Amino acid sequence: MKWREIAITTRQENADAMAEIFEAVGAMGMVIEDPQLIASYIESNVWDLHDVEIPDVPEGMIRVKTYLAIDNTLEERLAALQEELSARERSEKWPAHAWTMTDLHEDDWAHAWKAFFKPEKVGRRVVIRPTWEEYVPKEDDLVISIDPGMAFGTGTHPTTVMCIRALEDYVHAEAHVLDVGTGSGVLSIAAALLGAKRVLAVDNDPVAVATAQENVILNQVDEIVEVRRNDLLSGLSEQADILVANIIADVIIRLAPQAAALLAPEGIMIASGIIQNRLDDVVAAMTEKGFSIEELISHGEWAAIVARRAGVSAEG
């Protein structure tokens, strides 16, 4: 199959909205090229300068890429994408978007991003290692070997890093964990390696489900982690001690009532993928459903929330 890669330069704070737009037109996945994030990795010696190319975009901007199958619906979806972006430019005063488009074979798409993915210690103990890179573990390291394929999530994006660090703080030996929108499965694998008794990982994307399952088996946690195709929390009844969702603000807001119902009393919800200017909206939605905010975590333009479900009252 051939794919049309669409690369668009936009403001950093528009990343959340761009994900919604791409999903609405049926695009497959999103890649964010953030020069500030890449530069911070280089400065911290996570990557060598020669390993990556820093995107040439104006300050405060990022490049986002998505992929549309080249088929008989392509022109219709490109027109819908253009219409949605034009509407945002008019109503929300977004700057005009510069587009580039490139045609790719699936093999090109599946391998082009690998130059950007290097081993990285993302928490106090958790290390993410791509399967094609060597890494010598240090004492107490928990190494996740991962091949994210075409699914969302390598484990090194700030939104995922904040989730992993929160999991390090809250996972305990008897914990049942629910990972909503699992992508590559990295958060579920981290929870299992940190000692969770059971993890249920769900995603509505069949490519993500297949990739997550492969990564779970690769890391030998398939007796702990079950990967299932599911539309968010729809139809789930299994109670969890910890629910982790690294998605986007509007989806987290929609999840709040179901999350409150599925979490055990005093259960923990870790929500990430929230752009800073939507943080107050998510906090309000969660507190309205009875959550108390334990922690607010920030990393650049991104935020994460750790919240606790209310316990059972003495009368209940």
Swiss-Prot record:
Keywords: Cytoplasm, Methyltransferase, S-adenosyl-L-methionine, Transferase. S-adenosyl-L-methionine binds at T160, G181, D203, N246. GO terms for cellular component: cytoplasm. Its EC number is 2.1.1.-. Pfam families: PrmA (PF06325). SUPFAM superfamilies: S-adenosyl-L-methionine-dependent methyltransferases. Gene3D superfamilies: Vaccinia Virus protein VP39 (3.40.50.150). InterPro entries: Ribosomal_L11_MeTrfase_PrmA (IPR050078), Ribosomal_PrmA_MeTrfase (IPR004498), SAM-dependent_MTases_sf (IPR029063). One of its GO terms (molecular function) is protein-lysine N-methyltransferase activity. It catalyses: L-lysyl-[protein] + 3 S-adenosyl-L-methionine = N(6),N(6),N(6)-trimethyl-L-lysyl-[protein] + 3 S-adenosyl-L-homocysteine + 3 H(+). It is found in: Cytoplasm. One of its GO terms (biological process) is methylation. Its main location: cytoplasm. Belongs to the methyltransferase superfamily. PrmA family. HAMAP family: Methyltr_PrmA (MF_00735). Methylates ribosomal protein L11. This is Ribosomal protein L11 methyltransferase. It comes from Heliobacterium modesticaldum (strain ATCC 51547 / Ice1).
